[in-house]
Amino acid sequence: MVKYPLILLLIGCAAAQEPRRDGEWPPPAILKLGKHFHDICAPKTGVTDEAIKEFSDGQIHEDEALKCYMNCLFHEFEVVDDNGDVHMEKVLNAIPGEKLRNIMMEASKGCIHPEGDTLCHKAWWFHQCWKKADPVHYFLV
């Protein structure tokens, strides 16, 4: 009899990790802003909308075009230094609104030292780290 509440608890925990997608999340204003950068970076990198959606709403996966798309977004949002390395202070300063900034700060706590041989790989490392840290709120435009 004890196993049924445990199973329900495990199902509830798994469901709680599903990405939030509703009329207010991801924030419509951010999606609108992000479309501009998507329209710049997608053609530059050759990433597919399916790869972006799968990473955002589905499973973390490795795709070179997607990795470079993420790097392009960092450059377009101007959150990198002269060497192309991401600076979290710039990322946080680029995020509008205290609520969204706090969500990002919390998700970033364990995402400080990126791994990767290229800027594209480092960009992907940040994104997969954020998604693992907060799969409910993470989204990719």
Swiss-Prot record:
Q: Which residues form the signal peptide?
A: 1-16
Does the keyword field hold Secreted?
Answer: yes
Query: GO biological process annotations for this chain's record?
Result: sensory perception of chemical stimulus; sensory perception of smell
**Database matches in SMART domains:** PhBP (SM00708)
Per UniProt, subcellular location reads as: Secreted
List S-S links within the chain. 41-72, 68-120, 111-129
Q: Does the keyword Repressor apply?
A: no
An example of a Gene Ontology cellular component annotation for this protein is: extracellular space
Query: Gene3D superfamilies annotated for this entry?
Result: Pheromone/general odorant binding protein domain
Q: Which GO terms describe its molecular function?
A: odorant binding
Family that this chain belongs to: Belongs to the PBP/GOBP family.
**What is this protein's name?**
Pheromone-binding protein-related protein 6
